[in-house]
């Protein structure tokens, strides 16, 4: 982020989908790798994810002046579930391809867990608690168009325009576009 030649970042996938969620065996591995203190292993692993996503969210912004950051956009070509939505929620703008088979959401509750990488907090901050509740407590997933209507996705674009539109936004984003309201 310190390189002046880099104007911003677009996080995307070359595959038809962005991410269908995290392999839950990773959570089990965090616990077993910790030996005698599985709770500490799980805590440290989850906090590591939080630190990474917070770096995306801050994107080099000086915490005192709120200046100097770089815009980060998520460009979702298809399905984005679980961590596949938590990563975009840490970005400054979420673009999704108008893909009728794509599903977007946080279905973790369906297996008895909450989004662990900050998605719970970021979704509530983006939508407010009442609007976020069905997505968090029911594991509701839906199409890109319906997620735009709900306020989760910022723009739905033609699949062949996804990267071009995200790039256009990154190159024209202002500092006001990249400072989250809760950081002000």
Q: Predicted regions: what is each one?
A:
Residues 11, 23, 88, 123, ...:
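Terminal peptide-recognition signature
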Residues 86-90, 131-184:
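Amphipathic alpha-helical segments at domain termini/boundaries
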Residues 1-40, 51-75, 97-102:
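A structural preference for short, pocket-lining loop segments at secondary-structure junctions
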Residues 78:
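Conserved AMP-binding
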Residues 60-63, 67, 81-135, 150, ...:
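CoA-thioester-processing core
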Residues 21, 43-46, 50, 82, ...:
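Glycine-rich phosphate-binding loop at the start of an alpha helix
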């Amino acid at each position: 982020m310190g390189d002046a030649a880099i104007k911003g970042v677009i996080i995307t996938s070359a595959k038809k989908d962005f991410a269908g969620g995290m392999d839950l065996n990773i959570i089990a591995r965090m616990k077993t790798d910790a030996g005698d203190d599985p709770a500490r292993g799980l805590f440290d692993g989850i906090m590591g994810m939080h630190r990474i996503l917070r770096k995306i969210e801050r994107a080099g912004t000086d915490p005192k002046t709120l200046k100097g950051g770089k815009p980060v956009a998520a460009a979702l070509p298809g399905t984005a579930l679980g961590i596949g939505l938590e990563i975009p929620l840490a970005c400054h703008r979420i673009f999704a391809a108008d893909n009728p088979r794509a599903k977007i959401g946080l279905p973790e509750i369906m297996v008895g867990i909450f989004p662990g990488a900050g998605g719970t907090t970021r979704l509530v901050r983006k939508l407010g608690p009442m609007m976020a509740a069905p997505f968090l407590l029911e594991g509701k997933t839906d199409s890109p168009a319906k997620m735009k209507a709900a306020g989760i996705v910022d723009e739905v674009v033609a699949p062949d325009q996804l990267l071009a539109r995200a790039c256009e936004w990154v190159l024209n984003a202002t500092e006001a576009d990249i400072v989250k309201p809760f950081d002000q």
